[in-house]
């Protein structure tokens, strides 16, 4: 896969990590970014994993709410074929599950 994919994916993962860390004032989340995998865990043990998948050029989300989803890079960010955005979906799910508001 191209360097461009890695740059976009890494930039997305780092920005998401930074945004969650900055907004988690009540320490509701355990957020880790290692080896191209962003792990977001709530105190109750529920986890979201966001990872780059080089062979397909996609970002993959594993969620306790929506299951496994694959997002393609588009002009609107990382999106599903139905138009849902990775940042929006992740923000909504984590906000709902944690009881706090997170914006990505």
Short names for language-model regions:
Residues 1-49, 53-104:
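N-terminal intrinsically disordered, cationic/polar leader segments
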């Amino acid at each position: 896969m191209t360097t461009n994919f890695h740059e976009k994916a890494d930039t997305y993962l780092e920005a998401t990590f930074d945004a969650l860390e900055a907004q988690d004032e009540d320490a509701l989340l355990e957020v880790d970014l290692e080896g191209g995998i962003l792990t977001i865990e709530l105190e109750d043990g529920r986890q979201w994993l966001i990872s780059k998948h080089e062979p397909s050029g996609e970002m993959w989300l594993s969620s306790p709410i929506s299951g496994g989803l694959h997002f393609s890079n588009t002009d609107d960010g990382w999106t599903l074929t139905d138009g849902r955005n990775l940042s929006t979906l992740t923000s909504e799910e984590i906000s709902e599950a944690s009881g706090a508001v997170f914006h990505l």
